[in-house]
Amino acid sequence: MATETIAVPEIHCDHCKTSIEGALATIGGVERASVDIAARTVTVRYDEASVDRGALVEAIEEQGYEVPAQ
């Protein structure tokens, strides 16, 4: 298992949290996704053999949030 913290500067409310966590929960291999509204980050615990960072970023961006290049 790997843990990735992804900065998402546009996070600002509970709707953002619900939207992003819900999108990540649908990805096979994601064990847990947690949005920190105050820090504007998403922490994801996932099986790196099943999913990669690119898929996580894509799921966040599909919800309408920009993820800056790392």
Residue map of PLM features:
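Flexible metal-binding regulatory segments at protein termini and peripheral loops
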Residues: 1-70
